[in-house]
A protein has these predicted regions:
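Conserved ABC transporter NBD signature motif
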Residues: 76-87, 91-92
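ABC ATPase "signature
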Residues: 233-234
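Conserved ABC ATPase "signature" region
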Residues: 18-27, 116, 120, 127-145
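Catalytic Walker B motif of ABC-type/P-loop ATPase nucleotide-binding domains
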Residues: 174-178
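Conserved ABC ATPase signature
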Residues: 149-153
């Protein structure tokens, strides 16, 4: 189980004059600091998939980066199975698989070599890495491009390789930042099936998305954030109950509570 309590993160604004008019009007801009995440809390238990929703700029990516230990929060806590992630980030990274919004593959390496390299970073031996790559290639349908250099990969090939690289060490928690963005229908379904497989294994998955059909299909829990704050946190049934119509209406109902406050 992962439990997040009252996460907050601000960034210094080097030159306020360069901000857009929209950014200047954002209430999170306070003096020379932009408070990207102000108060985010949620829980994801074993075997659950949690969908993290919010408009562009809500603080979703910053939140996920803090969960992955890529960013250190200014305040708040991240607990995985009773262990404080922020106090022991090196140990925590071995338990976490993180897909960032940017694939960042090494272009001169093949797909296999990209995954292999991350396996080595996690201390896996050669045989274990080879077996795991074979397993992931089967699950993510990667065999046709696995041994090609990644600089020529399509968006779907890059994303599949990045996902495989993120989970090569069989992490206890998987965090995915918009894993299906830019993918075609077939690649999207492959990735969604992979997430479903993680769920069936009991691995908690937290992923951000703008696609509410993915939330409908996969998620047990939903967290909506806006302007860096948790506006809704509950199960999918409670989320649907926010409005009697579509999930889009439920999402808008959660976001509109920001305005009403």
């Amino acid at each position: 189980m992962i439990e997040i309590k009252k996460l907050a993160k601000k960034f210094a604004v080097e030159n306020p004059k360069n901000l857009s008019e929209q950014e200047k009007q954002d209430p999170r801009l306070k003096g020379r600091f932009f408070h990207s995440v102000q108060d985010v809390s949620f829980v994801c238990k074993k075997g659950e998939v949690l969908g993290l929703l919010g408009p562009n700029g809500a603080g979703k990516t910053t939140t996920l980066r803090m969960l992955s230990t890529a960013l250190k929060p200014d305040s708040g806590s991240v607990i995985i199975d009773g262990e404080n992630v922020l106090a022991q980030p090196v140990i925590a990274r071995k338990k976490i698989g993180f897909l960032s919004g940017s694939t960042g593959l090494y272009g001169r390496l093949t797909g296999r070599e990209n995954i292999d390299y991350f396996g080595q970073l996690h201390g896996m031996n050669e045989k274990s890495i080879a077996n795991r790559i074979q397993e992931l290639a089967d699950l993510l349908d990667m065999h046709s491009f696995l041994d090609r250099r990644s600089e020529n990969f399509s968006t779907g090939m890059k994303q599949k390789t990045a996902i495989a690289r993120a989970v090569v060490h069989s992490p206890e928690l998987v965090i995915l930042d918009e894993p299906t963005t830019g993918l075609d229908i077939m690649a999207t379904q492959t990735v969604l099936e992979f997430i479903r497989g993680l769920k069936e294994q009991g691995t908690p998955v937290i992923f951000s998305t703008h696609h509410l059909d993915e939330v409908q299909e996969l998620c047990d829990q939903v967290t909506v954030i806006d302007q860096g704050r948790t506006m809704f946190d509950g199960d999918i049934a409670s989320f649907k109950a926010l409005a009697e119509g579509s999930l889009h209406q439920s999402f808008m109902a959660a976001i509109q509570s920001t305005v009403s406050e």
